[in-house]
Curated annotation (Swiss-Prot):
Protein role: Essential for hematopietic stem cell development through the regulation of p53/TP53 pathway.
Gene Ontology biological process terms in this record: regulation of signal transduction by p53 class mediator; ribosome biogenesis
First-listed, main subcellular location of the protein, grouped into a coarse class: nucleus
Domain of life from the UniProt record: Eukaryota
Compartment(s) where it occurs, according to its Swiss-Prot or TrEMBL record: Nucleus, Nucleolus
Stored Pfam families: Urb2 (PF10441)
Name of the protein: Unhealthy ribosome biogenesis protein 2 homolog
Key word tRNA-binding present: no
GO CC, any one term: nucleolus
Length: 1524
């Protein structure tokens, strides 16, 4: 046989054997164990290699598929486990260079032509060689082969191939780069490495890195590149450049090329044969032929930033700053923008500008972050070489302004941060192009502009040259320009920045700046305002600057130096006399039909200045007694009517009237400022002692009326504009928002002086401007903006709103009027008839509706019911044909209004409003709904109505409703309406919307009946009427007549069921309580018995199974639970023979029903786990069923059946962990009842199942759910109060349980990743077991097993959520041992501290300051650190036991804390804990630590101990003085 197989070698070499047969023979020889060829692996590999080499050298002709199969054959050998095992066992397999060369040739062919012929197989072979160290040596030994391969691979990738080849290609590139990096590390000839990288690898790798950075292959899709691999390859390329181009050995060459040329002193160094490395790199970089023209600009730009970063990483250190700078101009010269001349901005596209400016930003940031630019050193030693370069960059940026690009602003910001003198010569152009004349609209660009302006102002504030800066700003503003095209000078960003800067300035600089603006205004603008629109716009810009300066200066006060006060007072007087009054004089006495633009802007300007002056004047007068206002004293003066405060001093009232008429022609900034002036006047009036005089009150009313009336027209336009809150941004478009904001912000002042018409108008505006539809998506930059909707919504939810009684009442009226108008619009009859039938819809005065209670009330003592005319009227309308029908659009409108009503405090309404709202809401709820209303919309509407009725009836005035309507009549009206409406609902019974609706209806009806009981309102009468109504209702009569189920209304049946159930739920407990106090009325007991029978009949009808797969409806489960509770309650309560027999018969008559539901619930319990209410109701039923032995089936044990059903719930893998945790308390209540009533044998069954589940073999079988369910059952069991034989049975099993938990935890912790679904519950139940104390676990060995569990649980490499879940559980176990096992702790303190130290060190590791990443995980670490601090306090409380170990605990802490830099909050908590341990250390312990700690640790301990003495011990010593 061996002879046959040995002939294979000859057949492979034979020319007569077909290639098909050769390949089959070769494959067979490789896989067969009976083929005894000498050195078989080498022979077969050489045969395939020789065949391919012969083919590619044209010595052999082969078909294409044969070539492909030969490559695949080599690939199979290279990737086979057999070959790997042979190599691992030391066998040598030689790859010939000829194979490697043809691989390189094929890759080169692919890179040049893009031909993918055989390329996948070739790449697989290459990957097989490179991934096997024993084979890869052929590449690593021949560096030129690796360089050639890597170069061609990168060029291949640069062609941007697609399809399956992508992943394979980049896998090989990743491997090749890894090997080449190892070669570079071992390279002893830096010149060779530099030459290889720059000549062969620099260009393709730069292009490849650019493409990878742009995400060319990382989009989702088949054959695409993984992001992790992309990031790794980019990192490898950077490492290759660092190791090849920027080697430490080349530093002298870089110095020769960069520094010596500059100094004219050419020196020869050790590397003199290597010519200018920087020139070599840059020439290769800017060469135009290595990539497409469309890519060249961006490749060069991105590469410039990379090369400079790598240069700094390699060579930057103290003393090399000049060298690192000299590279910068050379690299900057590679960018296109460096060669731009004047007026050549358009030579580059926007995308090119963006790319290159981003690179310039990176370069400048590198300079700033590494402190390369030292101003003094540059000036003294280097003749301002750096300064001149930065000036060149600054001129380039200023001359080619690119305001739409955020990076342009950031570059300028960095330049001014380096040295303000860089931009000082172009300061005016900078301010013009970056601020005054810049057109900035995009959010990111606004933020960049804001940061630049902030830096400019902060810089000049530090230099105390803000007046100089403002001189430049004023110069730019006053330049001739098309002002209408300019953006507002103080939009939100610049205004915020300027305000923050001005607040920090000393008063003298503020006053200098103020004076400067005033002078410029007077000299350059004021004389030329007449009929000049541009000048008028300039005046507005200067007014805004003045407003910002005056509003953001520090207020004068009693501590302000007198010269500053006097100068400020002079400035105020000068401004009024020389600026405000002349500007006011420019406004016409008689306004024309349409005011000119210049007049509008002048009026805006002067009114802004007037408002500013008045506001600042009032502030100075209030805060500084040395300031004497031109307006006279502000407070404490009793004024005559003729001397009431004016708007401005020196301006007559008649002149203001003319100004009012003029500004009334247009809504703009001037109108807003005039309103502010009137508001300021009101405040001044209120500060007088005579503000309550008739004249003062009349003046206040007139002023308030003016403020409200001036914007009435604009508010009616319903604008959707948004306002940033800055005065300068008030315009015709944003004025309504600013006006409404002014009113709402000052309503506390205005509301007392408004007439009823104005109050009603404000209420209507508030309602009209509230958002009633879906919230629209808002862009990031508009989030902080103010809109009408935001203002109104905030005011509606404000606690001040209900306090403004007049406005609140008017708003309530508006809402009911709007609701009533929509309802009346759906009237199907004559409006006169409807007004007679539903008069409250047409009554706008709540008081009239509220007084109906007097009209309908009986004469008699409190508690006697009134007549029910309203209810009877409503009932007749509901039964016959309700006169109102709403369609879809009307319903949507009403839903919006209901949303508004839900925001009101319905529980605090006064009786008149309460009654009116109740009637309106009830009318809505019983209204007919048209065909255009979908079932979902109708359900949403009804649910909302009854929710609001429920909220209303929880209020303080709920009793007032029962003065005009019987409770039973309300019940009947509601259900009659709902029974009729339910027939049109095309909706599934288990639809969440329907179930929510049933819940809301049930809650409303139950609260209604509870209120009847609380108020003791004719209980027998009301409940008899309710019971009679339900028994005569259509759904009940249909059910009783046993008609065909499909012809009946299932929704109506469920409504009836909910009503009966809630009736049982109310009457049952009430009668039970009555039994305790006094004899329960027999009539109510009879009614309850009747209701129970009715409920049982309906339930039996509803519980008839339908089609296959039928499930219990959730409503039925809760209803049957209530029925059983009522049945059992009657059974236990009734003492009389007759009633007792009747209740027995009732209970027995429902046995089949209860048993059927019981069986169905046991089957469905796992499915119900995801529905909280249904699951609770099911468990409640099972609890009640378990407590009624007469209902138990005779065949099976109820305990066993229920227990196995609960086990199925816990063991169901489809139930999420969170759901299991949520239902655990409910299961615990059932379990407690079961074990309390159950026998010892029942408990033994439970214990047996728990121990089976805790068997470690379940982990080996990967049956995690069985383990988790057993642990959960054990936790439930431990929470049950057991005694006697049951308790001893549990404690006897504790050792076995602890051992099982130890094994389970060990298995779960060894899995990768750690099985936290097992570890977490195991720790929980272990803590619960340990908390039972030494009576339960008496053997110290079993407690010590807990320490082994704690040490086994891994705390490394956990996600933040996982860490936050595991850590507290570990802490709980430790705490349980410390608190509950004092005897064990006497000998186990080292084990305890070992486990505790793990927790401390893990907190240090997680709480260290990381180089990158957010601090989102910090709250989790802080919680864990607090637990550590608490444990330290518990240890310190046991001083006698732990005193000996305290120095070792401190030493461990110091040892670990020196390894990390902690977040301050984490460090503070840990230090507070270790201070408590230091309290236990005596002086010899401290001396021991100082002597034994290593030097580095000694310093940390010294600092720690000093802080301890300073902050902790001193504080506690101080406290002891006051301790008795």
């Amino acid at each position: 046989m061996a002879a046959v197989y040995s002939g294979i070698s000859l057949k492979l070499k034979s020319k007569t054997t077909s290639w098909e047969d050769k390949l089959k023979l070769a494959h067979f020889a490789w896989i067969s164990h009976q083929c005894f060829l000498p050195n078989k692996e080498q022979v077969l590999l050489d045969w395939a290699r020789q065949s391919l080499v012969a083919f590619y050298k044209k010595k052999l002709e082969l078909k294409e598929d044969i070539v492909e199969r030969l490559w695949i054959y080599i690939d199979n050998i290279l990737h086979s486990r057999k070959l790997q095992n042979l190599l691992k066992n030391g066998k040598t397999i030689n790859l010939q260079i000829s194979l490697v060369k043809i691989i390189n040739e094929r890759v080169a062919e692919f890179s040049l032509s893009g031909s993918q012929r055989n390329i996948c197989a070739v790449l697989r072979c290459c990957q097989g060689i490179l991934s096997t160290p024993a084979l890869a040596v052929i590449y690593t030994a021949k560096q030129e082969l690796m360089v050639a391969l890597l170069s061609q691979l990168c060029w291949s990738a640069c062609r941007q191939p697609e399809g399956a080849v992508v992943a394979q290609l980049f896998e090989v590139i990743h491997l090749a780069l890894g090997h080449y990096l190892l070669i570079l590390q071992q390279q002893v000839n830096p010149r060779r490495a530099f030459g290889d990288v720059t000549a062969h690898l620099l260009q393709p790798c730069l292009v490849l890195r650019h493409l990878l950075s742009g995400g060319t292959w990382t989009q989702a899709g088949q054959g695409q590149l993984r992001q992790v691999l992309s990031r790794d390859i980019r990192s490898q390329i950077e490492a290759m450049f660092r190791g090849g181009i920027f080697q430490p050995e080349l530093l002298s060459s870089y110095k020769e090329g960069l520094l010596d040329q500059q100094q004219g002193d050419v020196k020869t160094g050790a590397m003199k044969n290597l010519l200018a490395p920087m020139d070599t790199v840059l020439n290769r970089l800017v060469d135009a032929g290595y990539c497409a023209a469309s890519l060249h600009t961006s490749v060069v730009a991105n590469s410039v930033a990379l090369l400079y970063k790598l240069f700094l990483d390699s060579y930057f250190k103290e003393g090399n700053q000049l060298l690192c700078f000299q590279v910068l101009p050379r690299l900057f010269g590679c960018l296109k923008i460096s060669h731009l001349q004047e007026e050549q901005s358009k030579a580059l596209s926007t995308s090119d500008w963006t790319t290159e400016l981003l690179v310039v930003e990176q370069l400048l940031n590198s300079v700033a972050n590494n402190n390369i630019y030292n101003i003094a050193a540059d000036r003294i030693r280097h003749e301002e070489a750096q300064f001149r370069f930065y000036r060149h960059v600054a001129e380039l940026l200023i001359n080619h302004a690119q305001a739409p690009i955020p990076a342009w602003f950031r570059c300028l910001k960095t330049l001014i941060s380096l040295n303000h003198l860089i931009l000082e010569p172009d300061l005016d152009d900078l301010l013009a192009s970056a601020w005054i004349d810049a057109e900035v609209t995009e959010f990111r660009t606004k933020k960049a502009q804001e940061a630049l302006i902030r830096t400019v102002f902060q810089t000049y504030a530090k230099l105390r040259q803000v007046p100089r800066l403002f001189e430049e700003v004023l110069g730019v503003i006053c330049r001739p320009a098309a002002e209408a095209l300019r953006q507002p000078v103080l939009a939100s960003g610049p205004s915020t920045v300027l305000s923050a800067c001005l607040l920090e300035l000393p008063p003298s600089q503020i006053l200098d700046t103020w004076s400067l603006v005033l002078e410029k205004f007077q000299s350059l603008v004021l004389p030329y305002l007449q009929s000049d629109a541009d000048m008028a716009l300039k005046s507005l810009s200067l007014s805004l600057l003045l407003h910002c300066i005056m509003f953001n200066m520090r207020s004068l006060d009693s501590s302000t130096p007198l010269p500053i006060v006097r100068r400020t007072q002079c400035m105020m007087e000068r401004m009024m006399r020389e600026l405000v009054q002349p500007l006011l004089a420019l406004l016409p006495d008689t306004p024309g039909p349409e005011p000119e633009l210049w007049l509008q802007k002048v009026s805006d300007s002067v009114l802004l200045l007037s408002y500013t002056w008045a506001q600042v004047d009032a502030m100075f007068s209030l805060n500084c007694s040395q300031y004497h206002s031109m307006s006279g004293p502000l407070i404490g003066v009793a004024l005559e009517i003729s001397n009431l405060p004016s708007l401005l001093p020196g301006v007559k009232t008649q002149h203001w009237k003319k100004i009012e008429k003029f500004t009334a022609q247009f809504s703009s900034l001037g109108t807003y400022c005039l309103e502010q002036l009137y508001l300021q006047k009101m405040k001044r009036t209120l500060m007088q002692t005579s503000f309550r005089s008739e004249g003062a009150i009349q003046s206040l009313r007139c002023d308030a009326a003016f403020i409200i009336g001036s914007g009435r027209k604009s508010l009616n336009q319903r604008t959707t504009a948004s306002w940033d809150g800055q005065v300068g941004m008030v315009s015709g478009l944003t004025y309504p928002v600013a006006h409404w904001h002014l009113i709402v912000s000052n309503l506390t002042i205005l509301i007392s002086y408004l007439c009823p018409d104005d109050v009603g108008y404000l209420a209507s505006v508030l309602l009209r401007t509230l958002p009633m539809g879906k919230a629209q998506e808002v862009s990031i930059d508009e989030e902080a903006y103010i809109t009408l909707e935001k203002i109104s919504k905030a005011f509606l939810h404000s606690p001040l709103f209900p306090e403004m009684q007049s406005l609140h009442s008017a708003f309530l009226t508006c809402v009911t009027t709007s609701c009533s108008s929509i309802l009346c619009s759906g009237a199907q009859r004559d409006s006169g008839l409807v007004s007679q039938q539903l008069p409250w819809l047409f009554e706008k005065d709540h008081m009239v509706v509220g007084h109906w209670e007097n009209r309908f009330a009986k004469a008699g003592p409190e508690g006697i019911e009134p007549r029910g005319e309203i209810a009877q009227n409503l009932l007749s309308l509901v039964k016959s044909d309700f006169p109102i029908q709403l369609e879809g659009e009307q319903l949507e409108s009403i839903l919006g209004l209901l949303e508004v009503i839900s925001a009101l405090q319905l529980d605090s309404l006064l009786p008149p409003y309460h009654v009116h709202y109740f009637l309106v809401l009830l009318s809505m709820a019983v209204t007919k709904l048209g065909c255009s209303c979908s079932s979902s919309l109708a359900l949403k509407f009804l649910t909302t109505c009854y929710q609001l009725l429920g909220y209303l009836q929880k209020g303080k005035s709920a009793r007032s409703v029962f003065k005009i309507m019987y409770g039973s009549d309300i019940f009947e009206v509601v259900l009659t309406s709902l029974f009729r409406a339910s027939s049109r609902f095309l909706i599934e019974m288990d639809d969440p919307a329907w179930l929510e609706f049933l819940q809301v209806i049930g809650t409303f009806l139950e609260e209604l009946m509870q209120m009847l009981i609380q108020m003791k309102l004719s209980l027998v009468l009301n409940f008899r009427k309710i019971t009679a109504f339900l028994s005569s209702s259509k759904p009940y009569t249909e059910a009783a007549s046993s008609k065909q189920l499909e012809n009946q209304n299932p929704q109506g049946r469920q409504l009836l069921l909910v009503s009966l159930t809630r009736l049982c739920h109310v009457l049952g407990p009430f009668l039970k309580e009555q039994k305790l106090g006094q004899e329960a009325p027999a009539a109510l007991s009879e009614l309850l018995q009747q209701v129970v029978l009715q409920t049982g009949a309906v339930l039996q009808l509803c519980s008839v199974p339908g089609a296959r797969g039928w499930r219990l409806p959730s409503v039925l489960i809760s209803s049957v639970s209530t029925l059983l509770e009522a049945d059992l309650g009657q059974h236990c309560r009734d003492g009389g023979a007759d009633i007792s027999q009747g209740s027995d018969r009732t209970l027995l008559s429902h046995v089949a029903l209860y048993q059927g539901v019981y069986s169905q619930i046991l089957l469905e319990l796992p499915a119900l786990a995801g529905h909280d209410q249904s699951f609770q109701a099911a468990l409640q039923f099972l609890t009640l069923f378990f407590l009624a032995p007469e209902l138990h089936p005779k065949k099976d044990s109820v305990f066993t059946s229920m227990f196995h059903s609960v086990r199925r719930v816990l063991a169901d893998p489809e139930i999420p962990v969170q759901v299991t945790q949520d239902i655990e308390p409910h299961l615990g209540a059932l379990f407690t009842q079961m074990l309390e009533v159950g026998t010892t044998e029942d408990l033994r069954l439970v214990m047996q199942c728990i121990l089976q589940g805790l068997d470690v073999s379940n982990m080996w079988k990967a049956d995690v759910q069985a383990v988790v369910s057993a642990v959960t059952l054990l936790r439930l069991l431990l929470n049950c109060p057991l005694s006697g034989e049951k308790a001893s049975l549990l404690w006897r099993a504790c050792p076995q349980i602890v051992t099982a938990l130890t094994l389970l935890n060990r298995e779960a912790s060894q899995e990768q990743p750690v099985s936290l679904t097992v570890v977490g519950p195991v720790l929980d139940v272990l803590a619960a077991l340990l908390r039972q104390g030494e009576e339960a676990i008496g053997n110290p060995h079993h407690v010590s097993l807990a320490f082994s569990i704690l040490l086994t649980v891994p705390l490394d490499h956990l996600k933040p959520l996982e860490y936050g879940s595991v850590f507290p559980r570990l802490h709980n176990v430790l705490f349980s041992i410390l608190q509950c096992h004092p005897k064990v702790m006497l000998k186990a303190i080292p084990s305890f501290l070992n486990s505790f130290n793990r927790l401390v060190f893990s907190v240090m590791r997680e709480g260290r300051q990381k180089d990158k990443g957010s601090i989102d995980d910090l709250p989790t670490v802080l919680k864990c650190a607090r637990l550590v601090e608490r444990m330290y306090s518990h240890i310190a409380a046991r001083a006698e036991e732990f005193a000996v170990f305290s120095p070792f605990m401190v030493a461990q802490y110091v040892l670990e804390v020196q390894k990390v830099t902690l977040y301050p909050a984490v460090k503070s908590l840990l230090q507070e804990g270790i201070y408590l341990i230091l309290d236990l250390c005596i002086e010899p312990d401290v001396q021991f630590l100082r002597a034994s700690l290593q030097p580095g640790m000694r310093d940390i301990f010294k600092e720690l101990y000093n802080d301890y003495l300073k902050y902790h011990k001193a504080k506690h010593e101080g406290e002891k003085r006051y301790t008795a």
